[in-house]
């Protein structure tokens, strides 16, 4: 467990840092982490996508996913890990708490204004992250059936059928009812057909 493996899908985990991320090589040196104790994802593979089966193996091999973020919107990686029964450590910010069950960990943080995005972000509390990591370590190897059940609720086909299709049908009906005069009105379609026919 002395080896830290960083696997990421955004600029905050780029080896040399981009955007609001930071240079992880310099950061590791500042923390005096010995060489060989920190491993980075192959940066070429990282940019060209890690195959799904490899990601599933990484999630399954992990005791916990550390995904405390400053401003992650939805957090697909949390659900990917959940689908592999891997609990997560997430920020008490955005929708992240909705993506974990009671056997995962939620950490607080300090809000700050990100003027580039014109929105508040949150800097995760490092002490709480350490506490969560230590709790996960103390718990030992653990698989979360609850996390998997939660992830299945976000299945793309299910979400589309139960949420998106009805919303798009309502939007189509609204557009048909409120189309300006002289413009072609959309024709409603059956529930299993295309969403909009003009």
Predicted regions and their residues:
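A charged, aromatic-enriched C-terminal amphipathic alpha-helix characteristic of glycosyltransferases
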Residues: 124, 128, 138-167
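A short alpha->beta transition loop at the rim of the catalytic pocket in nucleotide-sugar-dependent
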Residues: 63, 85, 92
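Short hydrophobic beta-strand element within catalytic cores of glycosyltransferases
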Residues: 78, 87-90, 104-106
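Short alpha-helical segment that forms part of, or immediately flanks, the ligand-binding pocket
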Residues: 55-56, 79-83, 94-98
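C-terminal alpha-helical cap of glycosyltransferases
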Residues: 135-139, 157-188
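Aromatic "clamp/platform" in nucleotide-sugar-dependent glycosyltransferases that forms part
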Residues: 70
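Nucleotide-activated donor-binding/catalytic signature segment of Leloir-type glycosyltransferases, i.e.
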Residues: 18-57
